[in-house]
């Protein structure tokens, strides 16, 4: 019967096969135990690794964002923790159509967030008003007319992968900032693009042709000898049906 290997032989075999690199040696040199950096890099590294978003979803774009909270995309790996209070958040994600009635509430939430704070405009309806801006008189034509926007995420709606790309780009922006120069690059006015103006347009279909007064006026204004399609209906109404 062969003899069993000793404990030292088993340890040597384990180090040779399982850990070929070996255990790193601890050095006492000062240059190997100290990492030199700046206060800006340390501050930015802490902020970009713990962005706490405030989710402001008003339409279908938020459904795509809700998919990130599941296990398939793992939204938490970026250090993003959704918050329900604006005083605990430093990232505002606006997803969906913003109306005139909701605009004061959105501005109030943004003003309650502590500095430094960032805004992501998610979706076409948030950036330009989208398809609702053509006929609606209450849709805001771009959220940047209300609050400053740091990153635009187009799409109708954007995919979850696009949201990840936007978060990565925002992390790069946060990592390149400087505490001394941040106040110089902030927007001095809230309305970032063109002036938000609405022009009242008269409706094409007013329903006036359905009124009896309008029909009588049209008959009176018609030239002599010319009949209208409604002459017989107006002058000679249909007799009432008498039930036996």
UniProtKB/Swiss-Prot annotation:
<keyword id="KW-0479">Metal-binding</keyword>
<dbReference type="InterPro" id="IPR006138">
    <property type="entry name" value="NADH_UQ_OxRdtase_20Kd_su"/>
</dbReference>
<comment type="function">
    <text>NDH-1 shuttles electrons from an unknown electron donor, via FMN and iron-sulfur (Fe-S) centers, to quinones in the respiratory and/or the photosynthetic chain. The immediate electron acceptor for the enzyme in this species is believed to be plastoquinone. Couples the redox reaction to proton translocation, and thus conserves the redox energy in a proton gradient. Cyanobacterial NDH-1 also plays a role in inorganic carbon-concentration.</text>
</comment>
<keyword id="KW-0874">Quinone</keyword>
<keyword id="KW-0472">Membrane</keyword>
<dbReference type="GO" id="GO:0045271">
    <property type="term" value="C:respiratory chain complex I"/>
</dbReference>
<keyword id="KW-0520">NAD</keyword>
<keyword id="KW-0521">NADP</keyword>
<comment type="subunit">
    <text>NDH-1 can be composed of about 15 different subunits; different subcomplexes with different compositions have been identified which probably have different functions.</text>
</comment>
<feature type="binding site">
    <location>
        <position position="125"/>
    </location>
    <ligand>
        <name>[4Fe-4S] cluster</name>
    </ligand>
</feature>
<keyword id="KW-0813">Transport</keyword>
<dbReference type="GO" id="GO:0019684">
    <property type="term" value="P:photosynthesis, light reaction"/>
</dbReference>
<dbReference type="GO" id="GO:0048038">
    <property type="term" value="F:quinone binding"/>
</dbReference>
<dbReference type="GO" id="GO:0015990">
    <property type="term" value="P:electron transport coupled proton transport"/>
</dbReference>
<feature type="binding site">
    <location>
        <position position="61"/>
    </location>
    <ligand>
        <name>[4Fe-4S] cluster</name>
    </ligand>
</feature>
<dbReference type="GO" id="GO:0005506">
    <property type="term" value="F:iron ion binding"/>
</dbReference>
<keyword id="KW-0411">Iron-sulfur</keyword>
<dbReference type="GO" id="GO:0031676">
    <property type="term" value="C:plasma membrane-derived thylakoid membrane"/>
</dbReference>
<keyword id="KW-0004">4Fe-4S</keyword>
<dbReference type="Pfam" id="PF01058">
    <property type="entry name" value="Oxidored_q6"/>
</dbReference>
<keyword id="KW-0408">Iron</keyword>
<keyword id="KW-0618">Plastoquinone</keyword>
<keyword id="KW-1278">Translocase</keyword>
<dbReference type="GO" id="GO:0008137">
    <property type="term" value="F:NADH dehydrogenase (ubiquinone) activity"/>
</dbReference>
<comment type="similarity">
    <text>Belongs to the complex I 20 kDa subunit family.</text>
</comment>
<dbReference type="InterPro" id="IPR006137">
    <property type="entry name" value="NADH_UbQ_OxRdtase-like_20kDa"/>
</dbReference>
<feature type="binding site">
    <location>
        <position position="60"/>
    </location>
    <ligand>
        <name>[4Fe-4S] cluster</name>
    </ligand>
</feature>
<keyword id="KW-0793">Thylakoid</keyword>
<dbReference type="GO" id="GO:0051539">
    <property type="term" value="F:4 iron, 4 sulfur cluster binding"/>
</dbReference>
<feature type="binding site">
    <location>
        <position position="156"/>
    </location>
    <ligand>
        <name>[4Fe-4S] cluster</name>
    </ligand>
</feature>
<protein>
    <recommendedName>
        <fullName>NAD(P)H-quinone oxidoreductase subunit K</fullName>
        <ecNumber>7.1.1.-</ecNumber>
    </recommendedName>
</protein>
<dbReference type="GO" id="GO:0009060">
    <property type="term" value="P:aerobic respiration"/>
</dbReference>
């Amino acid at each position: 019967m062969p003899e069993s290997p000793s404990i030292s032989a088993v340890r040597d075999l384990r180090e040779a096969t399982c850990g070929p690199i070996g255990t790193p040696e601890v050095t006492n040199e000062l240059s190997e135990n100290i990492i030199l950096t700046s206060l800006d890099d340390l501050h930015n590294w802490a902020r970009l690794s713990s962005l706490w978003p405030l989710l402001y979803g008003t339409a279908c774009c938020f459904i795509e964002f809700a998919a990130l909270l599941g296990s398939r995309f793992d939204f938490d790996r970026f250090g993003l923790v959704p918050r329900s209070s604006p005083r605990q958040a430093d990232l505002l994600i606006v997803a969906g159509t913003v109306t005139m009635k909701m605009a004061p509430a959105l501005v109030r939430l943004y003003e309650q967030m502590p500095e430094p704070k960032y805004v992501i405009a998610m979706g076409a309806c948030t950036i330009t008003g989208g398809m609702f801006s053509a006929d609606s008189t209450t849709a805001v034509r771009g959220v940047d007319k209300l609050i400053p926007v740091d990153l635009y995420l187009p799409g109708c709606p954007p995919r979850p992968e696009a949201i990840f790309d936007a978060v990565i780009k925002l992390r790069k922006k946060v990592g390149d900032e400087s505490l001394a120069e941040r106040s110089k690059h902030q927007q001095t006015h809230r309305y970032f693009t063109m002036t938000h103006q609405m022009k009242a347009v008269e409706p094409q279909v007013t329903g006036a042709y359905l009124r009896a007064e309008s029909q009588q006026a049209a008959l009176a204004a018609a030239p002599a000898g010319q009949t209208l399609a409604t002459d017989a209906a107006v002058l000679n109404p249909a007799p009432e049906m008498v039930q036996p």
